[in-house]
Amino acid sequence: MGVISGPVIGGNYGWPFAKSMLDVTSYGYEEAEYFIEGEATSYRQVDGTEWGRDGKWQAEPDKSSPYKTRLLVYRPTEQERFNGTVIVTWNNVTAGYELFGADSLEVLEGGYALVCASVQRAGIEGLPPVKQGLADWDSERYGSLNIPSDDFSYDIFSQIGSSVGPDRDFSAPDPMAGLQVKRVIAQGASQSAGRLGTYFNAIAPFDRSFDGFILSIYFGRGTPLQVGDELVNINNAQYNDSPADRLRGANVLRDDLDQPVFIVNSELEAMACYGVRQPDTSKLRWWESAGTCHVSQQSRAARKLMADRDKLITVDANDGINAIPIGPLYDSAFYHMHRWLSEGVAPPIQPRIDFEASGSIVRDDDGIAKGGIRLPQVEVPLAINSAIPLKPDIFAYLGGSSHPFSKEEVLARYADRSSFLKAFESVAKLAVEEGVLMPRE
């Protein structure tokens, strides 16, 4: 297990990179950053075994290397506020800097602890041409960090999970500040979900650092165990295929482990995963949300606020991308996974998006997807929101589209504002009753 040091303070900015935009103290929480260092192990495919569609992959230790990285912690200040669940999120590095959800109201109001784990090389070194990794952003604070290769990311993630779990070393600096941890959940979104897919299929059979897994906006394919010196970048010129082909599902999640798994996908990932969909079981929940997409106008706006504060250079969002945030479903997944592990109450099964035999989504006369989880903005629409992209590039592909109805079209649907609000509220209440939305939404 890695050695913990901290809390970390100082640096050029005086705050942790990509910290929460919320005043967490007003929720009875505190923010603290720690470093963890030690020896990490890489893994390789066991000789003579097949890494096939069934996800029952066999891995074994390969090499070892020293590492040093960070974990950003949000925890209740009082034991009475803590529900016993720690969520460890695998920070996403697709943008060339770290992204993670530190603004979850379910976390802050529900009494969880959140640990944002930096486990990939690009998070520290950034991606060319504009390098905005931790060491470049604040060399004084983060200049000593080092992850030699993403090959070691899986074990680093395990070590971070163990360092905040119930059997952690209490004699060392404690990222949980003495809180009585009962369970640890692994969470990852997008590229990080792909890495967790590989972790679940190849590492979880012999490593019990995590009690449950939440994979959000997951494309249905695991990432490699070994990439060597490569800085993984989906925008590399080496990719000549279309985004849809590049991100198409390729494998299922293994079905022989006792840790529960929760998939929360938008319409976009539902399309990608069409060929590797799995039925709901006693250990798997698979949600698909119609009318949503990988990225929304709301998530882009939230990211821009963080980027402006932390003085980052970002890619301008395409106008007209999807306008229905899927974020509220992430909070619901936290709530349901916590109950699943703590009380044995499985999350509610939800309908899947309707597909033609060809793999195309069945759409209504307006072009809105049929089936699936139907948020109020889908069931009582003011626009046609979908995962259909406006342009062929990767960023447009992830953003889908939103086509607002004209004033005349709105009036043809709803007699007046009151009628619209009544219908919207009715669907929202139903979503709460079905366990799709939390009451606060």
Model-derived segments and their meaning:
Residues 1-441:
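C-terminal His-loop and adjacent cap/lid subdomain of alpha/beta-hydrolase
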